[in-house]
Amino acid sequence: MLLEIRAAIPEDASVACQVMRRSIAELCVADHRNDEAILKRWLSNKTPEVFGSWIRQPDNSLLVAVEGGKILAVGSVTDAGQITLNYVSPDARFRGVSRALVGALEARAMERGNTRCTLTSTETARRFYLASGYVEDGLPVGNFGTSSGYPMSKLLASHDA
């Protein structure tokens, strides 16, 4: 089947939130260590209501990766080039879905005039981003009670253009 990456719509909210919540709970154990307090904080804004507000933000691009009508991943990038979300369904891990979604997020950032993207990676995704051309941009920072948020950036285009 063909993977389609498109702008999220309000009707995606419920399923997209399930994808994000499963991704965090099942794939990010190295980050939350099954600590209920950390999980509760991390999952607290992964609701259909908050998802709807992300869609409506004028300086934000919220994308979904869809295959056969099923949402497999959710990603977001601000107009300033900051990737704020990149979650893949555990059912779609290691199939190139996250790589395709990050490529679309980077393309959107470039459309907005950015020459680099920034993000804060989880421990779980750190090797993925390094393999995707990102470099670490500082000391780890705490996220949701963890100490495993890694500031990273990637040059997208030449500053000499």
Residues of each region from the PLM?
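Conserved N-terminal entry element of GNAT/NAT acetyltransferase domains
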Residues: 1-14, 157-161
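Acetyl-CoA-dependent GNAT
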Residues: 7-10, 18-93, 102-104, 108, ...
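Glycine-rich phosphate-binding loop
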Residues: 96
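Conserved GNAT acetyl-CoA-binding A-motif
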Residues: 109-122
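Conserved catalytic-core motifs of GNAT/GCN5-like acyltransferases
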Residues: 118-120, 135-151
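Conserved active-site tyrosine of GNAT-family acetyltransferases
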Residues: 129, 134
